[in-house]
Curated annotation (Swiss-Prot):
One of its GO terms (molecular function) is exodeoxyribonuclease VII activity. It is an enzyme of class 3 (hydrolase). The gene is xseB. PANTHER family: EXODEOXYRIBONUCLEASE 7 SMALL SUBUNIT. This is Exodeoxyribonuclease 7 small subunit. It comes from Photobacterium profundum (strain SS9). Belongs to the XseB family. GO terms for cellular component: cytosol; exodeoxyribonuclease VII complex.
Amino acid sequence: MAAKKPENMAFEAALDELDSIVNELESGDIALEDALKKFERGIMLARTSQKKLTQAEQRVEILLQADDEAPLTEFNENNE
């Protein structure tokens, strides 16, 4: 079965596959040619996931700007 194109995958599914690829590559028990294919797939997944995340952030900003009552505040990763 052919792998789904990253752009057709749900964000969470792409991250799960990317995590699996990272674990395989870190194990070191994979042939060079297979490792290169996995690395290439991982790069595609990472780029597509980043694009989807950026789009989601932009949607949130637009929704917050549409509500004049709600102030737009900076996102803080550490919840501080």
